[in-house]
A protein has these predicted regions:
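Inter-lobe connector of SF1/SF2 helicase motors
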Residues: 133, 198-226
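Short basic/glycine-enriched coil/helix segment immediately N-terminal to the Walker B
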Residues: 6-8, 83-84, 96-104, 127
Length: 226
């Protein structure tokens, strides 16, 4: 199970509808805070970690995550939860508001943390002082895309160290262009350490139906000749 393989700093990878959200909450509830729903209900430790979910503005506004919280008796309204702790759901546009949070648990949802902009800077600051996992359908297209997550996991101190160890730039272009990566065996090993794939079986079957209709045979014949 993906839940058994998750750890702090993991990337939970799966398509839409694969169950990433509920798996992430199950990890927070059980492995991070000692709760259980298996044989009998065991509540989380008292007090549990505050929970912050950074997601898309659409998911925040449609309360999609609120529905995922309910089975775990969690809510953004402390009065509706027996734990009375802080649960925050907000968008990536507001991630900078939470850089001073400490000793909480963060779920980063629906966004590849790539590049070197404000979101990545806030992400790296948050991960220094909190526990976290990241949910993504497409975690990275190139090794450069993994730099922020590798730094957050402590594999490299900064981008400069990563580039020095692994990146060869093309010398004949006016702008930085990666020519090749070196020591890819180490990169593959590091990615394997943090990437957890969801197993998702689509229970759909092909259904063919033949519909007999009238048509203009002459017109059809002329059309197919052109």
């Amino acid at each position: 199970m993906a839940l058994d393989r998750l750890n702090n700093g993991s990337i939970l990878c799966g398509d839409t509808g694969s169950g990433k959200s509920i798996t992430a909450l199950a990890y927070y509830f059980s492995k991070e805070n000692g709760g259980s729903f298996e044989d009998e209900y065991i509540p989380m430790k008292d007090p549990p970690q505050d929970l912050y979910i950074i997601t898309t503005a659409r998911k925040r506004d449609t309360l999609e995550w609120e529905g995922e919280l309910a089975p775990f008796l969690l809510s953004t309204n402390p009065k509706l939860s027996p734990y009375h702790h802080k649960v925050v759901i907000d968008s990536w546009n507001n991630i900078g508001k939470y850089t001073e949070v400490k000793d909480a648990f963060f779920i980063f949802d629906e966004q590849r943390v790539v590049g070197y902009g404000a979101w990545v800077k806030a992400f790296l600051k948050i991960t220094k002082s909190n526990r976290w996992i990241l949910l993504s359908a497409t975690p990275g297209d190139t090794w450069m895309d993994y730099i922020p997550v590798f730094i957050a996991n402590g594999f490299y101190k900064n981008k400069t160290e990563f580039v020095r160890r692994h990146v060869v730039f093309n010398r004949f272009t006016r702008y930085p262009k990666v020519d090749k990566y070196v020591d890819c065996g180490r990169l593959i090993k590091l990615r394997k350490m943090i990437l957890v794939n969801m197993r998702f079986m689509k229970n759909t079957k092909r259904n063919d139906e033949t519909v007999i209709v009238d048509y203009d045979k002459k017109l059809y014949s002329e059309t197919t000749k052109t």
